[in-house]
């Protein structure tokens, strides 16, 4: 999603 999710503390694309 290009940002950080609540369950994932790393940037997602």
Curated annotation (Swiss-Prot):
InterPro entries in alphabetical order: Periviscerokinin (IPR013231)
The protein's predominant localisation is secreted
UniProt keyword Secreted present: yes
A Pfam family for this UniProt protein? Periviscerokin
Swiss-Prot/TrEMBL GO biological process terms: neuropeptide signaling pathway
One GO cellular component, as annotated: extracellular region
Give expression by tissue. Answer: Dorsal ganglionic sheath of fused ventral nerve cord.
- Family (UniProt): Belongs to the periviscerokinin family.
The name this protein goes by in its record: Periviscerokinin-1
Organism equals: Sarcophaga bullata
């Amino acid at each position: 999603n290009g940002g950080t999710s609540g369950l994932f503390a790393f940037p997602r694309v």
